[in-house]
């Protein structure tokens, strides 16, 4: 079985409704260093990351320590929104209170793509893999693994490490990452 280390990006320098692609702030950079210190003894491992700046900056610490380059995969990116920048925060707060059954078909397809991509890693490689991604993508994977239909089935903190196993096209939760109060900024 392939272990997947799902890392939520570090704290962003701006909120969801203020910047389409913020980097990390000082706290986020410190979180990324701490996460890298926790994972460093396990590697080097293959890495996959979302194309967004906050995930790239989070992954960069491990890339540097391990001397590897993460593969960018938009499938593990942020939950898609057609809302304007000003309306995104309100939209996300509303959506996160629901279930995947209540979500739009586009969001359901996004969730299915995230889950399928993560489940496929175990079919493609026997190597444990680090995936630097986002709050909702991690929840989509954990929800699929546990049969929980809520968009938010737990609250992974910034730079938390959630461990799943991928085998036979299925995901299984090994360990949930550290949880924190997450506020949509």
Language-model regions: role of each:
Residues 12, 137-138:
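Short active-site segment of divalent metal-dependent hydrolases/proteases
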Residues 9, 134, 180-181:
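Histidine-centered active-site/metal-ligand motif
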Residues 96-126:
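Internal catalytic-core helix/loop-beta-alpha segment
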Residues 1, 64, 68-71, 78-93, ...:
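Acidic, low-complexity terminal tails and accessory targeting/binding regions
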Residues 2-73, 98-103:
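Active-site-proximal alpha-helix that buttresses catalytic centers in soluble enzyme cores
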Residues 4, 125-136:
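Generic beta-sheet signal
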Residues 33-40, 115-123, 142:
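Generic structural signal for well-ordered alpha-helical scaffold segments
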